[in-house]
Amino acid sequence: MAAGEVLRPAFLETLSLVAGDGNLRTDPADCWPYGYDNSRRHVPAQAVVFATGHAQVLGVVRLCTRHGVALTARGRGTGTCGGSVPLRGGVVLSLERMDRILEIQPADRLMVVETGATNQAVQDAAARHGFFWPPDPSSAAYCTVGGNLAFNSAGPRAVKYGTPRENTLGLRAVTGAGEELRTGVRTSKGVVGLDLTRLLIGSEGMLAIITEATLKLTPRAPCKRTLRAIYADVDAAARAVISIMAQPVIPCALEFMDDAAIDMIRVYSQADLPEHAGALLMIEVDGDDDYIDHAADALARAAKVDGLIAIERARDETQVAALWATRKALSPALRNVAPGKINEDVVVPVSRLAELVNGLRSLSSTHGIGIVNFGHAGNGNIHVNLLLDPRDSSQVRAAERCLDEVFGLVLALGGTLSGEHGVGLSKRDFVARELDPVALRLMRDIKRTFDPNGILNPGKGWPDEFNPPGGN
């Protein structure tokens, strides 16, 4: 069917049978909320199916591929790159009702879940057995495991514990061709065949729809220490990050904020910050009781570089909350200042962090666009926020030019365009600047193998010329 074409009554009748009673919506008012995500992009879906199990997903995919109808999987819509926006209309398949914890095996250190379960529900279930699942995006209370897997979204703990790719043992999925697929193992070792688990994680719903995941659990550390270090400028903070990451003790969080972020927090919150703060690091370490203070001392020593203004160590949970309040105040402040901001999540080698942030400051001045930078410094993963009024066409054009140069700077520093937000719609036209033609051709071939009719999340991930036809 052509993009925007109304779904035929016969198709909708069959779709209703496959979905089951109460699981299909076609009224435009009901479908409207399922046409957007946190990127603020919106394209209306023509139908929304609320899947309640793997069999329904299989039936919906087979029906859509038989009729050439675009199909976009969706969790809770917390993504920031338009990845769950149904660009070509068709059907949105919501997995939010597939939220069961199917199995927990402490001895095997694994948990099997449906992918509509929220990250927080997984953490709560694991905690009852003394474990956790390391990925911890800031939207953990709302985002789903399926979304975490689709974009390989991690969070602060990734610096020590890794991303979903390192913390997922296996998957159950349905390919775009309507074939059922199980990948991976239930063991800590396994090398039979190609690693399709890691291929599907981060594929943004373009190859298959993941219905179940076998998650690798990690024991919860009994103790944690939190430090906040404040520096005169970004260069000093970057030197501290390099110093911290070059010594043996690995922090479980190493978060960065630049002077623009600090100034914003100072205006919009009651956080206690020195007047001349030019950059800030939040440093956290976890471990056993007989190790934790030694580890915190080692990180504090590494953080003491020229340009350090002050370093504080929390002595109890109240002080921990007070130190983290600085970081948590940033997102509300950004929403107050620039509700139309562009939010990117670039990554550079840790050793190039100062060059990145100084380069961003230069681009901000050149284009007259405010830029606020913060993020996961231990990975070199910085959230670059371009502040603009979307109603001002001159600001929009300036921001577009600035963003183009931001991506150029990142690639010149040996970085990548996205660490955890994904490509989706927002970065698809830049992908060919990072990936070479051979890689793109192989990816297109893989897409055709998994999704020969091109129905799954069409128009995403890479420029249109690299997308196979179909899903219209």
Regions found by a protein language model. Give the residues of each.
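N-terminal flexible segment immediately upstream of the FAD-binding catalytic core
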Residues: M1-R62, G79-R109, S138, A261-Q270, ...
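FAD-binding subdomain of flavoenzyme oxidoreductases
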Residues: R100-I104, L110-E255, L456, N472
